[in-house]
């Protein structure tokens, strides 16, 4: 009984360590984003002294000056948290690689604070500001890596090894996919509605809202440069985007119809059930492609080229080459989701710029953190279909760890985007709050390891990106 109690107490203490480490990491991230915001609002110039304002000890004379002071106070608190986290890790005999990584972050922290003090006293200096930004993001990334490693050790299955080949064959021993009755209703009106719903399903409408938000964010970012955003350009770009997504989804249905019949969650798709004839679906996809390219061409030729590339990449490169052949299909395939950011930017500016590339990078890095949750939830289904998704090939423990890693990289890229595009407080709050929520559910996934937990993390990833994209639109158009 005493041994069981000691084990339970140790598990609780380790959970607290993970909570403290995650809180410290997000605290560092908060400092980075608030620091970017203070630079944007010239708050640092309103309090150009250290540790407070004026002669070094005077109170601020303006609201933005108080923002700078608040940033420094929070920096002290987070620094204390970093030291406490390291101390708790030592007390709990956390594994060596985690302790070393946390120690590196704790060692870099006062150096980072000193650079911040120099920036505050000497005023804005590009070199020092870049060093300060990179330093803060590096500390955050270091702590996030330590968190992922510790969660892997404490919650992972030590017996789990890579037993599945890099390209698994469809597993015939798994339960068969459920039967689905494709019969159309006898009533002509109901039959027409059922057919219409089937064609709508081919376009994968659930993907459209988020990818349209990505394109919208790209357009509004482009409008802050030399670009001009008009209602006509916005409507044509979003219309072309919706149709290109629909075309890509339709071709995906066509090419995966045989595999869809083997998988539980896709066995009721229109082509898998012969609800829509294959050649009709192909013609439908071609029609959507043509109209999409026409709309993009009306905006500009580069947008049309990128739209065509997006359709080909998702339909051919991802569906035929990446998804069935490599465990890195999700990572490389993230380029398909990133292209709408460039299309939105190009639609307004006419060329590819740093802002569009920065937003595309955020989407690219977010994709594995987002989709690996779905891969965990449907691991058995993907194995049945013969797809080498990470949980199938490398195991669930490795996949959960990668969710944390890719989330951390996403937040780093989001911080870089805030700096490049001078985004404000709304963006900072959205990225911090929803990033913390995503991290919370990703950590919870490590402990619960259920399908429901994977879906919670999946939905949290959607909420994060949606909130960040809306914040970009708000910051660029309203503020």
Curated annotation (Swiss-Prot):
EC numbers on record: 2.5.1.141
Record's GO cellular component terms: plasma membrane
List, alphabetically, the InterPro entries matched: Protohaem_IX_farnesylTrfase (IPR006369), UbiA_prenyltransferase (IPR000537), UbiA_sf (IPR044878)
- Name where it mostly resides: membrane
So where does this one cross the membrane?
20-40, 64-84, 98-118, 128-148, 207-227, 231-251, 271-291, 303-322, 324-344, 345-365, 402-422, 423-443, 459-479
UniProt pathway: Porphyrin-containing compound metabolism; heme O biosynthesis; heme O from protoheme: step 1/1
* Superkingdom of source: Archaea
Q: Which cysteines are joined by disulfide bonds?
A: none
Region of interest called Protoheme IX prenyltransferase, as start-end residue ranges on this chain: 208-476
Q: Tell me the Gene Ontology biological-process terms attached to this UniProt entry.
A: heme O biosynthetic process
Please note every region of biased composition (Low complexity).
155-164
| Keyword set includes Cell membrane | yes
Ranges for region Unknown: 1-207
Membrane topology, record value: Multi-pass membrane protein
Q: Name one GO molecular function term.
A: protoheme IX farnesyltransferase activity
Q: List the residue ranges of the region (Disordered).
A: 155-186
The subcellular location is: Cell membrane
Which Gene3D superfamilies does the record cross-reference, listed alphabetically? UbiA prenyltransferase
Report the function annotation for this chain.
Converts heme B (protoheme IX) to heme O by substitution of the vinyl group on carbon 2 of heme B porphyrin ring with a hydroxyethyl farnesyl side group.
Q: What else is known?
A: Carbon 2 of the heme B porphyrin ring is defined according to the Fischer nomenclature.
So what family is this one in?
Answer: In the C-terminal section; belongs to the UbiA prenyltransferase family. Protoheme IX farnesyltransferase subfamily.
Protein name per UniProt: Protoheme IX farnesyltransferase
Give the species. Answer: Haloquadratum walsbyi (strain DSM 16790 / HBSQ001)
């Amino acid at each position: 009984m005493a041994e069981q109690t000691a084990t339970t107490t140790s598990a609780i203490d380790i959970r607290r360590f993970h909570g403290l480490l995650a809180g410290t990491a997000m605290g560092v991230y908060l400092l980075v984003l608030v620091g970017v915001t203070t630079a944007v609002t010239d708050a640092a110039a309103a309090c150009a002294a250290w540790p407070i304002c004026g002669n070094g000890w005077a109170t601020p004379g303006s609201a933005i000056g108080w923002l700078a002071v608040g940033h420094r106070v929070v920096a002290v608190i987070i620094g204390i948290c970093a030291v406490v986290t390291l101390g708790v890790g030592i007390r709990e005999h956390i594994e060596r690689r985690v302790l070393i990584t946390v120690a590196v972050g704790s060692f870099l922290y006062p150096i980072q604070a000193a650079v911040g003090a120099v920036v505050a006293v000497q005023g804005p200096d590009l070199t020092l500001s870049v060093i300060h930004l990179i330093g803060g993001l590096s500390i955050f990334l270091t702590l996030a890596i330590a968190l992922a490693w510790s969660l892997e050790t404490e919650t992972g299955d030590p017996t789990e090894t890579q037993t599945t080949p890099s390209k698994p064959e469809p597993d015939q021993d798994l339960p068969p996919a459920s039967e689905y009755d494709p019969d159309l209703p006898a009533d002509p009106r109901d039959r027409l509605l059922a057919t219409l719903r089937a064609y709508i399903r081919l376009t994968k409408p659930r993907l459209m809202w988020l990818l349209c938000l990505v394109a919208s964010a790209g357009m509004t970012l482009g409008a802050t440069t030399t670009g001009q955003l008009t209602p006509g350009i916005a409507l044509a770009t979003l219309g072309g985007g919706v149709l290109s997504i629909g075309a890509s989804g339709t071709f995906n249905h066509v090419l995966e119809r045989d595999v869809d019949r083997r998988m539980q969650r896709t066995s009721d798709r229109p082509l898998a059930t012969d609800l829509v004839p294959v050649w009709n679906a192909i013609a439908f996809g071609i029609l959507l492609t043509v109209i999409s390219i026409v709309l993009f061409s009306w905006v500009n030729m580069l947008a049309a080229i990128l739209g065509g590339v997006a359709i080909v990449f998702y339909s051919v490169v991802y569906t035929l080459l990446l998804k069935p052949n490599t465990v890195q299909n999700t990572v490389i395939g993230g380029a398909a989701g990133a292209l709408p950011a460039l299309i939105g930017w190009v639609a307004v500016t006419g060329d590819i710029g740093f802002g569009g590339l920065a937003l595309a990078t955020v989407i690219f890095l977010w994709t594995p953190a987002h989709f690996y949750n779905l891969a965990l939830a449907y691991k058995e289904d993907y194995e049945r279909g013969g797809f080498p998704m990470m949980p199938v090939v490398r195991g669930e423990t490795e996949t959960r760890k990668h969710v944390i890693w890719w989330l951390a990289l996403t937040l780093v890229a989001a911080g870089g985007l805030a700096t490049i595009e001078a985004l404000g407080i709304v963006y900072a709050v959205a990225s911090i709050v929803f990033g913390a929520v995503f991290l919370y559910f990703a950590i919870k996934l490590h402990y619960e390891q259920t399908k429901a937990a994977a879906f919670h993390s999946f939905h949290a990833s959607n909420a994060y990106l949606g909130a960040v994209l809306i914040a970009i639109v708000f910051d660029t158009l309203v503020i």
